Amino acid sequence: MAVGLGPLPTLHPVAGFELGIASAGIKRPGRKDVVVMRCAEGSTVAGVFTLNAFCAAPVILAKKRVQNAVRYLLTNTGNANAGTGEPGLAAAERTTAKLAELTGVDASQILPYSTGVIGEPLPVEKIEGALQAALDDLSENNWEAAATGIMTTDTLPKGASRQFQHDGVTITVTGISKGAGMIRPNMATMLGYIATDAKVSRDVLQNLMLDGANKSFNRITIDGDTSTNDCCMLIATGKAALPEINRAEGELFAKLKQAVFEVCMDVAQAIVRDGEGATKFVTVEVNGGGNHQECLDVGYTVAHSPLIKTALFASDPNWGRILAAVGRAGVPDLDVSKIDVFLGEVCIASRGARAATYTEAQGSAVMQQEEITIRIELGRGDCSETIWTTDLSHEYVKINAEYRT
């Protein structure tokens, strides 16, 4: 079940960015599993990619080509084309070469993306056979269909959109994402595509994508596994009648940054809310750190703990597991006598021990909720970080045990 995730909001079209969807039948006959995205000529494209050393063939190719004048993005689901060696790289090149042949652009202007089962050969002929249908389907109004087309174990499509005014001109930022398992992005299986009609220089766009990912996609985790295929792309078509943003300053940049960050946050949190088998959406706040890294270390140790995640699933306020996780997070010279821990607004541990006013009934009441905040005060400094995660349910085990059967 998706926690607090409803139907897609209105996804505003972005001038100069079109999406087309078709069926290649990679995993299931008739399923629409190929998505082609066309960027208007002159668009700038930025991206962040997985840091997994076993990165997939399409990631290798996309990283090489993202500096070029990108015109198309090609995504397939049902097959990750990862762990496939040189044949996998050749397969990714073949699919982009076919799309180049059909569109008249150079293959170096096409970025490939794949998601699905790792270690199986990419069905190149099936993908090639679906490309013309995807091209025929291209439309600026196809965001919702594309959000569905990139899904794998997701139960719901994920998207967000923002618009703002500047000098009488409306600027749009719209994005979609997919992911429900193998989620612990580190850039950043997860894919994200965000487009705007603002005109932005590539350097500014790349830094905007990095900052946006670090505050959203790189702060979510479901199971601690970093995918081989994670990518998040930001495209600026330049179709809005406003000057180019070539510096990270000024009112227009500030408005765009806020819109991009909000879209990133919405689609990143949607991945957590749709986590495989998730019944709880959990916010882990770590405050009072001596530096940001130790806040992240504590936050991720808590978020990844199987004992904490199963307690969350059982609605069991077993707060000792939280203390144990904080203690093993590797923070040097940690003074446990300064640590406070809260479940929601309920103080469960004060100065490293059970809070005098805490009762089991208070903790149980919080743990029964679908959305829970675990707040940890380290008492070491003024740095803070926030991680979003899920519980760990029987359904998560079932989904992943049966993934290939």
Curated annotation (Swiss-Prot):
How is this protein named in the record? Arginine biosynthesis bifunctional protein ArgJ
| Alphabetical list of Pfam families matching this protein | ArgJ
CDD domains in the cross-refs: OAT (cd02152)
* HAMAP family in the record: ArgJ
Q: Where is the active site?
A: 189
Tell me which residues are marked as the site Involved in the stabilization of negative charge on the oxyanion by the formation of the oxyanion hole. Answer: 115-116
| GO CC terms in record | cytoplasm
Localization, UniProt: Cytoplasm
Q: What is its EC number?
A: 2.3.1.35, 2.3.1.1
Instruction: Name the domain of life this protein comes from.
Output: Bacteria
The record describes its quaternary structure and partners as:
Heterotetramer of two alpha and two beta chains.
* Main subcellular location of this protein, as a coarse class: cytoplasm
The reaction(s) this protein catalyses: N(2)-acetyl-L-ornithine + L-glutamate = N-acetyl-L-glutamate + L-ornithine; L-glutamate + acetyl-CoA = N-acetyl-L-glutamate + CoA + H(+)
Its GO biological process annotations read: L-arginine biosynthetic process; ornithine biosynthetic process
Xref: PANTHER family: ARGININE BIOSYNTHESIS BIFUNCTIONAL PROTEIN ARGJ (PTHR23100), ARGININE BIOSYNTHESIS BIFUNCTIONAL PROTEIN ARGJ, MITOCHONDRIAL (PTHR23100:SF0)
Instruction: Provide the residue positions that the database annotates as binding substrate.
Output: 152, 178, 189, 276, 400, 405
Record site: Cleavage? 188-189
UniProt-listed InterPro entries: Arg_biosynth_ArgJ, ArgJ-like_dom_sf, ArgJ_beta_C
Family as reported in the entry's similarity comment: Belongs to the ArgJ family.
Q: Write out the function statement from the record.
A: Catalyzes two activities which are involved in the cyclic version of arginine biosynthesis: the synthesis of N-acetylglutamate from glutamate and acetyl-CoA as the acetyl donor, and of ornithine by transacetylation between N(2)-acetylornithine and glutamate.
Q: In which pathway does it act?
A: Amino-acid biosynthesis; L-arginine biosynthesis; L-ornithine and N-acetyl-L-glutamate from L-glutamate and N(2)-acetyl-L-ornithine (cyclic): step 1/1; Amino-acid biosynthesis; L-arginine biosynthesis; N(2)-acetyl-L-ornithine from L-glutamate: step 1/4
The UniProt keyword set, sorted, is: Acyltransferase, Amino-acid biosynthesis, Arginine biosynthesis, Autocatalytic cleavage, Cytoplasm, Multifunctional enzyme, Transferase
Q: Name one GO molecular function term.
A: L-glutamate N-acetyltransferase activity
